[in-house]
Amino acid sequence: MTLRESTPPADLTTVLHAACAQTGLDPAGARLIHHYANAVFLLPKEDAVARITSARHADTARTGLAVTRWLTDVVGYPATGPLPDLDPIDVHDATVTFWTYYAQHGRPRPDSTYLGAVVRQLHDLPHPPVELSRWRPLHSLHAAVADPAQSRALSDQERSWLLTRIEQVQDDLADLDYPLGWGPIHADAWAGNLLWDDTAPAPRVVLGDWDSVCWGPREVDLIPSWHAAVRYGKGPQWARAFADSYGYDLAAWRGFDTLFAMRDLVQIAGPLRQAPYNQTFDRSLKQRIAGVQADDRNPWVEF
């Protein structure tokens, strides 16, 4: 797993060491390798990673852990695997889970063809023996934007406009008929959540980051690849390769534009959290809001 590295805040290090003390894992040499919605630490002594989630999202962390245990241990689905026999640890207003570390050895990241295959496989599975929440599109984003403490990077005008737009897209989503039906969905199925797994008898690609797993319309897991083709400059061939691998052309469905608008809004959530502390994220937030307001199909520049 090769992700953005940074210097961890002192409170995250405290949480990590407290959780490791409860599990008997060795945090020596721990390194923060990702800090976005969650903080992810590499534990080199254990060949594992620790994911630190805010306590307010403890239920989703527990659900993701239970689902991936079923996927990996029972049905043999290619998901990132949690460390065996370790329950989530609640400590210092956070929840910590522990996972297998997948070293990427400088390989190219798996592309949309791999993603289409693993999403198709997921959508063909039965309901897991885990209670899944029902998909609530843009619910957490609406709450964050409505809370001045969480959205202080926004002007009052931006906040008001975004709340109206979120509610409009939510209404549009509720009016759609979903031809692929409802079932267990990943709900953030983009290629950045794919990793090479060399722990299996033969190298394979696994799907990670199961914090958003829920019961919802399967089309939700398809839109990220079309969105990446446009907003992140992957190009039409990226979406076509996904469609060929999955076996369905989402762009031919009448609800495509509504789902694209939803994904645009979803992508505001990440920089919204980080913008008050980081100018790069603030520029990214402003760019994305401008694109949503223009309702255009222009690529977003990575700052």
Model-assigned labels for residue ranges:
Residues 1-27:
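Juxta-kinase regulatory segment immediately upstream of eukaryotic protein kinase catalytic domains
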Residues 3-4, 148-154, 237, 269-303:
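ATP/Mg2+ or Mg2+-diphosphate-binding catalytic cores
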Residues 9, 13, 51-93, 103-124:
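A conserved alpha-helical element in kinase catalytic cores
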Residues 33-45, 49-50, 82, 170-222:
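Active-site acidic catalytic loop and adjacent metal/ATP-binding pocket
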Residues 94-108, 143-153, 264-279:
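A glycine-centered beta->alpha junction motif in the catalytic cores
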Residues 106-160, 180-182:
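A cross-family kinase active-site recognition segment
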Residues 218-250, 262-279:
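Active-site activation/catalytic loop segments of kinase-like enzymes and analogous catalytic loops
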Residues 251-259:
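All-alpha amphipathic helical-bundle segments outside canonical DNA-binding/catalytic cores
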